[in-house]
């Protein structure tokens, strides 16, 4: 029997198989060889290109057992019995996942750095090779971010093109062409697609749009509460709080169910306990009485508007898929892959099961419970348990389960020291850490715990360490034959955006080049600010302050330096200021563009400005001049302006795309552009800066600046050196106005902390709660501690060669510092 995808040969005659191996490799068949040292060396030398591409895997083995396994058909369990024990370099678990029966559902637990993306790509290649009728359009893959979807697309395409380059087999080109039809998307894009296919039974059509519905939700809450109470009686007595406060609390509490993905039908099955006192009874009664009605009427609003909201799109899809009337969609789904499954909420888990039930695909989910760090979005750290429970309830075949433990990312010396921490946290019940991973990276590395200094010395210490590590990395790269890539970076990771802002200020103050990646910062970026200033100058051309600001932007180009002392002598006289600034304005093309804006389409003129003016070059010149004035060293000026200019350029391209999508058309005025920018600059804190896509040459220079981001932003990434500068932040476990929901136990606890009058601090509105809050708060506190431990785990496992944690003395057990101290610290 000839192999379709792979052949495993153990202790076979190389003389007998050498020509066959040559033929298999040239057809794209993976060959896995186990033999003596001489045979292994011969194969790796003769088929070096295939070995480098991992199409040939050759391992030394001491046992004399013989075996041939074709396409993973290991009926006698040879891999488990012998190869896993006798050849640690062979990744038996990855082999078994890759070659698992194509009719099986699969769950893969993959710790950080164990190659989960690789195993997903290899699994798809196995399915393509062994199922001639399979098309990539029948393979669906769900990721949790657009970046992850893009990366998966790139990795699959690279794998197919590499095989084509090595073999010349046309099937790989055909699969590359088919790849554009493969459904790799984020969870929300997938839900939107499925709602358009299945939603007709609930009066949704394929014209379904996406809206926020924030206004409609607030109005609905107001109307339902208003309809519930007697307007002729005291409102506060019926609600326990004023109407406006009840409105806000109901909105927050209702959102709590949406966030966790609790379905509409399950909301009505929740146990709310009892009010703890007579003062809490009114709100308890209102809340339990209106929740189902809110959900019903909100769903009707969405139906009437033929629109859904991103916030509860998965709940809506679950509701649709569980309805009695389901259309038969024109979808063929043979395989459904879900990445980062530990970040799933209840509705996402149920939807994946319902898709299996309705369309009969084989399910493949991969994730790591130790990296479940999106609890604030509703992620369930018991996602794999819930999945198996839901599959059983729906009578879906039991999945095959695998665990990947071979770590290819982190230096063995670093990983072995990390394991001391992870093992203790596992014994403490803070981390699900069953057994240590096996390190395969033998590069030198180091983990350092540095005693944190106090108060104002803390920032200086952080800057010293950052500067030292940056210089050390630059020195290593410039004295190495290896070229730098996107992983060759010093990265500083923070827990919160507030810490990230503090870190950015510290590095800037100490003249250290740094790139800050934060969510929602696009409309606060230099790029948008400068563009907004330019647009404002055209609209308010008679006001000196707008012209002055314009002259400071890269759009003004190289002009004579303005003297602020000269301007002060004008004492704010309007005519003199206009005349003074006009001298500088004449050195630019501003007046030409101002005239063009009256004669030509606005967006066309703005595009001309970007094409004609050397905006990026001017930005670099301005930045260098300012840094030089501020005392920066020349090499750090070069590093900072290089990375900042790349980001500026990427943001500029993104801004023009946004303007074109939102304001495209000949009738757009400069005022429309100004109004759009003003609104978003003032309110939009969700749009993130553009992803900088660099070519190979550009990537080689990125290592000269530090990269700063939150741990959540860094998830899935890896870097040469990781610094964790802040470990003394207290975990948020205090009581507050909140709703706590146990979705598995179906319990609900709620609490209102009350309001005090500012002057005399007396209670204006007393605290309220229900009987389950204390119990659920204790559970929530422990859950918070476990999640914070997982976040620290994610931060630490981003490191490849070096990990530095700054650990100050901590008297509070609810900090990262205390977690580290639990294990013991050998301070540097």
Enumerate the predicted regions with their spans:
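Structured N-terminal alpha/beta-domain signature
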Residues: 1-70, 218, 222, 254, ...
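Conserved motor-region signature of P-loop NTPase helicases/translocases
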Residues: 2-4, 16, 30-45, 53-154, ...
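Helicase C-terminal subdomain and adjacent C-terminal extension
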Residues: 18, 42-59, 64-69, 744-769, ...
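Conserved ATP-driven helicase/translocase motor core recognized via long
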Residues: 28, 36-60, 138, 217-307, ...
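Conserved P-loop NTPase-based nucleic-acid remodeling module centered on helicase motor cores
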Residues: 35-37, 55, 137-246, 382-386
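Conserved helicase/translocase P-loop NTPase motor core
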Residues: 93-95, 100-103, 184-191, 217-221, ...
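ATP-hydrolysis module of ASCE/P-loop NTPase motor domains
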Residues: 97, 177-183, 199-287, 342, ...
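Conserved helicase C-terminal RecA-like lobe
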Residues: 486, 535-794, 798
């Amino acid at each position: 029997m000839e192999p379709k995808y792979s052949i495993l040969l153990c202790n076979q005659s190389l003389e007998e198989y050498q020509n066959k191996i040559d033929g298999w490799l040239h057809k794209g068949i993976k060959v896995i060889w186990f033999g003596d040292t001489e045979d292994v060396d011969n194969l790796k030398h003769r088929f070096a290109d295939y070995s480098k591409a991992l199409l040939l895997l050759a391992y030394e083995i001491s046992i004399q057992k013989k075996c041939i396994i074709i396409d993973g058909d290991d009926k006698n369990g040879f891999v488990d019995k012998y190869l896993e024990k006798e050849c640690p370099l062979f990744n038996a678990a990855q082999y078994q996942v890759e070659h698992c029966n194509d009719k099986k559902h699969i769950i893969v637990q993959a710790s950080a750095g164990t190659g989960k993306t690789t195993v997903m790509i290899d699994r798809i290649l196995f399915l393509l090779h062994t199922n001639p009728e399979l098309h990539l359009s029948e393979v669906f893959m769900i990721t949790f971010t657009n970046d992850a979807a893009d990366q998966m697309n790139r990795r699959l395409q690279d794998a197919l093109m590499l095989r084509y380059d090595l073999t010349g087999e046309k099937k790989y080109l055909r699969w590359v062409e088919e790849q554009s039809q493969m459904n790799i998307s984020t969870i929300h894009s997938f839900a939107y697609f499925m709602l358009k296919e299945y939603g007709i039974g609930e009066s949704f059509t394929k014209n379904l749009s996406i809206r926020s519905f924030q206004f409609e939700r607030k109005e609905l809450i107001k109307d339902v509460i208003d309809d519930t109470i007697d307007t002729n009686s005291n409102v506060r007595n019926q609600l326990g709080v004023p109407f406006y406060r009840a409105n806000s609390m109901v909105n927050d509490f209702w959102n709590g169910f949406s966030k966790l993905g609790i379905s509409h039908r399950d909301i009505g099955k929740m146990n709310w306990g009892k009010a703890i006192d007579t003062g809490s009874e009114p709100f308890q009664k209102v809340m339990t009485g209106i929740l189902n009605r809110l959900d019903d009427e909100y769903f009707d609003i969405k139906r009437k508007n033929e629109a859904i909201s991103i916030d509860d799109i998965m709940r809506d899809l679950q509701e649709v898929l569980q309805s009695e009337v389901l259309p038969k969609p024109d979808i063929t789904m043979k395989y459904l892959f879900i990445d980062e499954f530990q970040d799933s909420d209840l509705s996402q888990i149920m939807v994946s099961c319902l898709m299996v039930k309705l369309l009969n695909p084989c399910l493949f989910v991969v994730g790591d419970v130790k990296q479940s760090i999106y609890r604030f979005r509703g992620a369930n750290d018991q996602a794999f348990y819930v999945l198996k429970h839901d599959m059983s309830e729906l009578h879906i075949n039991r999945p095959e389960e695998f665990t990947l433990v071979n770590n290819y990312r982190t230096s063995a010396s670093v990983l072995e020291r990390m394991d001391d921490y992870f093992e203790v946290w596992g014994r403490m019940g803070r981390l699900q850490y069953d057994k240590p991973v096996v390190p395969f990276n033998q590069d030198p590395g180091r983990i350092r715990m540095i005693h944190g200094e106090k108060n104002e010395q803390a920032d200086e210490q952080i800057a010293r360490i950052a500067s030292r590590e940056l210089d050390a990395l630059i020195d290593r790269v410039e004295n190495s034959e290896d070229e730098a890539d996107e992983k060759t970076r010093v990265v500083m990771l923070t827990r919160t955006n507030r810490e990230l802002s503090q870190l950015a200020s510290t590095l800037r103050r100490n003249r250290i080049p740094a790139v800050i990646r934060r969510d929602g910062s696009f409309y606060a970026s230099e790029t948008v600010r400068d563009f907004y200033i330019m647009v404002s100058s055209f609209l308010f051309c008679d006001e000196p302050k707008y012209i002055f600001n314009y002259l400071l932007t890269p759009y003004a180009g190289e002009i004579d330096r303005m003297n602020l002392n000269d301007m002060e002598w004008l004492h704010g006289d309007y005519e003199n200021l206009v005349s003074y600034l006009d001298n500088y304005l004449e050195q630019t093309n501003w007046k030409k563009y101002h005239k063009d804006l009256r004669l030509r389409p606005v967006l066309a003129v703005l595009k001309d400005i970007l094409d004609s003016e050397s905006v990026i070059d001017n930005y670099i010149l301005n930045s260098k001049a300012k840094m030089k004035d501020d005392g920066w060293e020349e090499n750090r000026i070069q590093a900072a302006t290089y990375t900042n200019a790349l980001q500026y350029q990427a943001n500029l391209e993104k801004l023009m795309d946004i303007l074109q999508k939102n304001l495209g058309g000949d009738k757009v005025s400069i005022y429309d552009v100004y109004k759009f920018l003003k609104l978003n600059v003032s309110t939009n804190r969700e749009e993130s800066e553009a992803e900088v896509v660099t070519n190979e040459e550009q990537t080689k220079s990125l290592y000269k600046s530090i990269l700063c981001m939150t741990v959540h932003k860094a998830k899935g990434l890896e870097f040469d050196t990781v610094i964790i500068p802040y470990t003394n932040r207290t975990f948020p476990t205090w009581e507050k106005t909140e709703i706590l929901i146990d979705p598995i136990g179906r319990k609900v606890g709620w609490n209102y902390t009350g309001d005090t009058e500012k002057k005399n601090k007396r209670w204006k509105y007393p605290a309220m709660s229900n009987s389950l809050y204390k119990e659920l708060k204790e559970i929530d506190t422990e859950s918070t501690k476990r999640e914070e431990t997982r976040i620290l785990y994610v931060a630490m496992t981003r490191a490849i060669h070096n990990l530095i944690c700054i650990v100050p003395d901590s008297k509070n057990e609810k900090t990262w510092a205390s977690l580290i101290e639990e294990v013991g610290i050998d301070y540097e």
